[in-house]
Design a protein with these regions (language model features):
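Glycine-rich flexible loops
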Residues: 2-446, 458
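Substrate-binding pocket helix/loop in short-chain dehydrogenase/reductase
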Residues: 537-538, 542-550, 658
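Active-site helix of classical SDR
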Residues: 561, 598-601, 606
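Alpha-helical segment proximal to the catalytic Tyr-Lys
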Residues: 566, 611-612, 686
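Residue(s) in the substrate-gating loop at a strand-loop-helix junction
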Residues: 582
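Short, small/polar-rich loop/turn modules that mediate ligand/substrate recognition or access, typified
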Residues: 614, 619, 688-690
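Short C-terminal tail/terminal secondary-structure segment
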Residues: 689-705
Length: 705
């Protein structure tokens, strides 16, 4: 029981104290209400739905009191929206656009006219749903895509069920593409049914309202609760969902094994036009659907709600693989599933050719977004991790809709032409064209060893800032977790994973690459940066010193590269391996026998790898730093003391000494090494392999000959 309201299927999150602090600020209450609604993915999807409020304001030119509508702007998300995510428009001007409306065939031209109705010039651009709110008189309005409501809206008998369930208190508007005309249809429905508390949109979603932010919030929850309770009762009455289980899901550990083994193969196939990032989901809802008797009937039908198929494509690809299939031979697996991808691309091309108009945009990437693996789970692939994850969330919503619709009646998807007209809508294309240009490393996954701090963290940060998903790893768990938190705050949780890894332990390395494949679908860039330094004379070196240096530097580089190469070969997309070596690989000096020779081993191993991996389009290059003076582990383990002793100076004098001995008289920072690594992978040196880039300020003895 919440404030007198009892809800079983939705979350009542309203906090009277927080709302009281916003008393008198209707726009602030709109943002608050929107965030509450967007926090529950059962109510609306990420980026989906919109809310509004109408308030009195003073016109800055006439000084007259006018009615202004604040509504979620284009491209926003209710759960995270702030005041800056709202558009503010004159209500009277919006409604007056009816006088210049030329009919449904011309409704797209109305969008440009919204700009002539803007009240706050600093507000967000209006969305296509703006007139849907403007033509309704209510002060506060919510438009959501709740799974339970869409289950009714997408069922064969949706209109009759709506009228019976709500006894006429919720209206019905048949499916129609969002836009100016749909706003007029909502007004017509309300005019014909005065006193209703909401309107169900066929195959789309729900409109509800109230005179205050709180009234609208509660009304919205109550209508959705009624839908959800009805759907649940019908599920219980009808027994088996999705026709019952066709096959049993593998145990969780086995599902994960199949997923991380298969993901790089799928990623390679999905990336035939541009590199894609993967996501894997195997929650109970997904498992029930992919393991069901009705999967083969329902999945090809596609989704109903526009927000769903805009994110997931017209339908998913279903893999014809046994849950426990042997996936160890990537070539055989690819040979088996490649025909399914070919058939999917042909299906998508036929869909495009059969539905396109003279002015339709060119066909987009024909590869699937959602891939269903019976017995295992669901993969999704998109241009970045967030988009891939959200696509999975949207398809899970679609599963919920299909489950509910099948329980109460029969699920119906949108006709192909209607779906196409949404997907290739010129307004949708214009929105895509306005999106920022992809960064150089967008769609790439980079693993940087020793990235809890120092050079490794700087490299990972540079890659993340250029659009890559990054896998941080370090043997120091505390340092790694601190780096993960820092990266998550700066770049978002989706684009970073932190995995503890010991580069000297093959099982630890393999496990890290498996986790990376599960998280992102595979790997594109590996930077072997993990290292230590020990400075002693030959006489003072111990066998343990020698073994430790060679294990971490030479063996570690080999083990990580070997595991990464296996993943890259599965993908068939090439790749980059960058080895952080050292000036000391090429320059002899005192008290440096073990470290310098281990670095030399790294350097020659790099050349050998480059010679071998060329046919796989895997490039191997080296960056040779020297005397990185900031936040580097090179100063631990007695290295600084050893080098200072060798040069006859104090530790405090080392930075200046190192800078002065360079030709450029410059100190070297971790960011300098990061920039050098980016130079190899940023797109300008795609035909370079086996090369060495010195980042040492200019040390003549280290010039390569």
């Amino acid at each position: 029981m919440a404030n007198g309201h009892s809800f079983k299927h939705v979350s009542y999150l309203w906090d009277d104290e927080k709302a009281a602090a916003l008393h008198g600020d209707e726009v602030g209450l709109l943002v608050y209400r929107s965030n509450l609604l967007g926090a529950d993915l059962r109510l609306t999807n990420y980026g989906g739905g919109n809310t509004s409020c109408k308030v009195k304001a003073v016109d800055p030119i006439s000084a007259n009191e006018v009615e202004v509508m604040w509504v979620k702007g284009s491209g926003g998300d209710l759960g995270t929206m702030k005041r800056s995510g709202l558009a503010a428009l004159y209500v009277e001007r919006l409604r007056s656009l009816v006088s210049v409306y030329r009919g449904k065939a011309f409704e797209d031209e109305m969008v440009q006219l919204f700009n002539h109705c803007i009240y706050d010039l600093d507000s967000k651009a209006p969305s296509i749903d703006t007139p849907l709110h403007a033509f309704l008189p209510f002060k506060h309005i919510d438009h959501l895509h709740p799974d339970a409501a869409i289950a009714i809206a997408a069922s064969k008998d949706g209109e009759a069920i709506t009228r019976e369930l709500f006894k006429g208190s919720v209206g019905w508007v048949p499916w129609q593409r969002p836009g100016f005309d749909l706003g007029l249809q909502l007004k017509k429905c309300l005019d014909e049914n005065p006193g209703i508390r909401g309107i169900m949109l066929g195959s789309h979603g729900l409109f509800t309202w109230g005179n205050t932010a709180y009234e609208s919030y509660v009304n919205t929850l109550e209508v959705i609760e009624t839908c959800a309770e009805f759907v649940e009762q019908m599920k219980e009455a009808n027994g088996l969902e999705f026709g019952g289980e066709k096959l049993a899901a593998l145990p969780e550990a086995d599902r994960r094994r199949q997923a991380y083994t298969l993901a790089p193969v799928l990623r390679g196939l999905c990336s035939s036009q541009q590199p894609m990032i993967g996501h894997f989901s195997d929650d109970a809802r997904v498992r029930q659907f992919v393991n069901s008797q009705d999967l083969e009937r329902l999945a090809p039908m596609g989704t109903s709600c526009p927000d769903h198929f805009l994110r997931t494509k017209i339908s998913p690809l279903m893999l014809d693989l046994a849950p426990d299939a042997d996936l160890s031979n990537a070539e055989e697996v690819q040979e088996k599933i490649a025909p399914s991808f070919k058939a999917y691309r042909e299906m998508y091309a036929a869909y495009y050719e059969g539905c396109k108009h003279e002015n339709s945009p060119p066909m987009r990437d024909p590869n699937p977004v959602v891939i269903l693996y019976p017995g295992v789970g669901m993969f999704s692939f998109a241009k970045d991790k967030q988009t891939a994850r959200v696509a999975a969330e949207f398809y899970t919503n679609a599963i919920n809709v299909m489950r509910g619709a099948e329980a109460i009646s029969a699920y119906t998807s949108l006709p192909r032409q209607e779906a196409f007209d949404i997907e290739y809508w010129l307004l949708e294309e214009a929105k895509l064209q306005r999106m920022p240009k992809p960064k150089p490393l967008s769609g790439k996954v980079a693993l940087v060893t020793g990235s809890g701090g120092g050079i490794g963290k700087a490299i990972a940060k540079k890659f993340a800032s250029e659009g890559a998903c990054v896998v941080l790893n370090d043997v120091n768990g505390d340092r790694l977790r601190a780096a993960e938190q820092e990266f998550s705050l700066q770049f978002g949780c989706d684009s970073v994973r932190a995995i503890e890894m010991d580069v000297t332990d093959s099982s630890s390395v393999i496990r890290a690459l498996e986790e990376a494949s599960l998280a992102f679908g595979g790997i594109d860039i590996v930077v072997n940066n993990a290292g230590i330094s020990i400075s002693k004379s030959i006489g003072d070196h111990t066998e343990d010193d020698w073994d430790r240096l060679y294990d971490i530097l030479a063996k570690g580089q080999f083990l990580v590269s070997q595991a990464a190469i296996a993943v890259m070969r599965k993908q068939g997309m090439g790749g980059d391996i960058i080895n952080i070596v050292s000036k000391n690989a090429f320059v002899a000096g005192p008290n440096n026998a073990a470290y310098g020779s281990a670095k030399a081993a790294q350097a020659h191993l790099s050349r050998l790898m480059a010679a071998e991996l060329g046919p796989d389009k895997i490039r191997v290059n080296m960056v040779n730093p020297d005397a990185v003076i900031s936040d580097s582990n090179i100063w631990s383990g007695g290295w600084a003391e050893g080098r200072a002793k060798a040069y006859g100076i104090t530790v405090e004098e080392l930075p200046a000494y190192y800078a002065k001995r360079t030709l450029l008289n410059e100190s070297i920072l971790p960011e300098d090494i990061a920039n050098a690594c980016f130079a190899f992978v940023g797109g300008l040196l795609q035909k370079s392999t086996g090369n060495t880039l010195n980042v040492d300020g200019g040390v003549a003895a280290a010039f390569l000959r």
